[in-house]
Amino acid sequence: MTKKRVLSGVQPTGAIHIGNWLGAIRNWVSLQNEYDTYVCVVDLHAITVPHDPQQLKENTLRTAALYVACGMDPKKCSIFVQSHISAHSELCWLLNCVTPLNWMERMIQFKEKAIKQGDNVSIGLLDYPVLMAADILLYDADLVPVGEDQKQHLELARDIAQQRVNSRFNKESKSILKIPKPLIMKEGGKIMSLIDGNMKMSKSDPNENSRIALLDSPEIIKKKIKRAKTDSFLGLEFDNNQRPEANNLLGIYSMVSNQNREAVQKEFSNIGWGKFKPILTDAIIESLNPIQQKYYSLIKDKTELNNILNKGYIKANTISNQTLKRVRNALGFLDKPIS
């Protein structure tokens, strides 16, 4: 029986943090046993905002290495770099030409980021969701793991595929582009900031204390947890809207210690922050230790990492070119010459 295909990825911008790991990457690790899994380092998306070229190169390798260090198995999944597959850019352009401008202008994330960038906002930032649609549609993905903040982008990909390509250019019964479905993972879906329990933990937050990077040292982790925002209530609890920080920090502990919420609630219902924070700190350090060891082993000698990316490229390139050829033919382009 053919496995359903899953596609996901992370931008190589900033340091990957425990929110990325617990909210996304750790879920992908479990998915690779059940699905035909493709994991991409989405570096083309990283240049929609001002960036440092050398830092981009380093972050791209770092992100790929962390995928493997977190448990993505190259024998079970394909790990590749987005910009290595030229079909991403070509399909993006083809989709650009059939996607209405007003669809882009109503995207929430563009509006938010455009305000921050002012006159420096790029066309690439406006077009970001079309490139994301190309990423998804290029691999005939059946399912795409998404958080609540990405659901709008997946809906756009579905609309472009169905309304702007399949409905307009399909001359046969078989669809040109597969319509993907969202795969929403509930546990760890959203890890919040350490300094504001109402805000999502983010790589772009200028305050380093808002997040714990996967490569943070034990000393740094200890300092960040010590400074993490808390409240004045005695005892810790989940699901109290007046205590977002308690819910967040307990949730992190539950996941890094692999204990269910009921057990965690029982353990800490009568304990104060002063006793809880050192316990949380130790649990995070212990959970990140094997990831850090594997990462530094990979990054020290990049031969294995480059082989992994090359293997992923070959498989991803083959599938992406098949999809691109279908779209090119449907839109009326001549077949490319055989070199």
Curated annotation (Swiss-Prot):
Instruction: Report the catalytic activity.
Output: tRNA(Trp) + L-tryptophan + ATP = L-tryptophyl-tRNA(Trp) + AMP + diphosphate + H(+)
Cross-referenced Gene3D superfamilies: HUPs, Tyrosyl-Transfer RNA Synthetase
Residue positions annotated to bind ATP are Q11, P12, T13, G19, N20, G147, E148, D149, I191, K200, M201, S202, K203, S204
- Where does it reside? Cytoplasm
Which superkingdom heads the taxonomic lineage of this protein's source? Bacteria
CDD domains in the cross-refs: TrpRS_core
Which InterPro entries does the UniProt entry name for this protein? aa-tRNA-synth_Ic (IPR002305), Rossmann-like_a/b/a_fold (IPR014729), Trp-tRNA-ligase (IPR002306), Trp-tRNA-ligase_bac-type (IPR024109), Trp-tRNA_synthetase (IPR050203)
Per the annotation, which location comes first and is thus the protein's main one? cytoplasm
Q: Where is this motif: 'KMSKS' region?
A: 200-204
Motif 'HIGH' region — list its residue ranges: 12-20
Q: What class of enzyme is it?
A: ligase
Keywords carried by this UniProt record? Aminoacyl-tRNA synthetase, ATP-binding, Cytoplasm, Ligase, Nucleotide-binding, Protein biosynthesis
The UniProt annotation places L-tryptophan binding at D135
As recorded in UniProt, its EC number(s) are 6.1.1.2
Output the Gene Ontology terms for molecular function: ATP binding; tryptophan-tRNA ligase activity
Q: Give an example GO biological process.
A: tryptophanyl-tRNA aminoacylation
Name any GO cellular component annotation: cytoplasm
Role: Catalyzes the attachment of tryptophan to tRNA(Trp).
The record's annotation in PANTHER family points to: TRYPTOPHAN--TRNA LIGASE, MITOCHONDRIAL (PTHR43766:SF1)
User: What does the similarity note say?
Assistant: Belongs to the class-I aminoacyl-tRNA synthetase family.
State the oligomer form and interacting partners: Homodimer.
Protein name as annotated: Tryptophan--tRNA ligase
Organism of provenance: Prochlorococcus marinus (strain SARG / CCMP1375 / SS120)
- Record lineage: Bacteria, Bacillati, Cyanobacteriota, Cyanophyceae, Synechococcales
* Gene this protein is translated from: trpS
